[in-house]
Amino acid sequence: MTTYELNKYMETHPEIDDEIDNGLRNLEKTDNNVIIDSRMAWHFVPSSFSVYMTTDILVSAKRIMDAKRDSEPFSSIEEAVNSLKARRASESKRYLELYGVDIKDMNNYKFVIDTSIRTPDEVANEILHHYRLWKEGKPFPHTLDK
């Protein structure tokens, strides 16, 4: 099942979102330092340092193609781009309907970073740097573009 297929399935099976949401809500009650990969963690764990990692859609499609994922066997960049667009639309629709929130609103996140031209190490270092500033109550830019 591709990520897009899972998103389409979840549009008609809200019990999956409910289970995930309850797990996220429970994290808000803990004192643990954890990293969560979630489109909605900012909503359910509002005390968190929420980061949105954006990527140019062509870069994202190329990365997926280069990874040669069994679950996403695209035959062309165009096919990958179309699947990414459909997935994003499905997620946006689902979260708007379920929670009344716009996940594309960058104001929902403490920090936004464009990963299109950064290595994974550069992205991790920037996130850690900005997390430390946030933890210390120091100002930092909301968005780090190209």
Indicate where each model-derived feature is located.
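Short glycine-/acidic-enriched loop or helix-start segments at secondary-structure transitions
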Residues: 45-47, 62, 123-124
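C-terminal accessory "lid"/substrate-recognition subdomains
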Residues: 93-94, 112, 125-146
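Conserved AAA+ ATPase "sensor/coupling" helix adjacent to the nucleotide-binding pocket
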Residues: 66-68
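ATP-dependent small-molecule kinase phosphotransfer cores
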Residues: 1-45, 58-59, 70-72, 82, ...
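Short loop/helix-cap segments at secondary-structure boundaries that form the rim of catalytic
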Residues: 41-48, 104-107
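Conserved nucleotide-binding/hydrolysis micro-motifs of P-loop NTPases
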Residues: 55-60, 119
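Small-molecule kinase domains that catalyze NTP-dependent phosphoryl transfer to phosphate-bearing small molecules
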Residues: 72-126
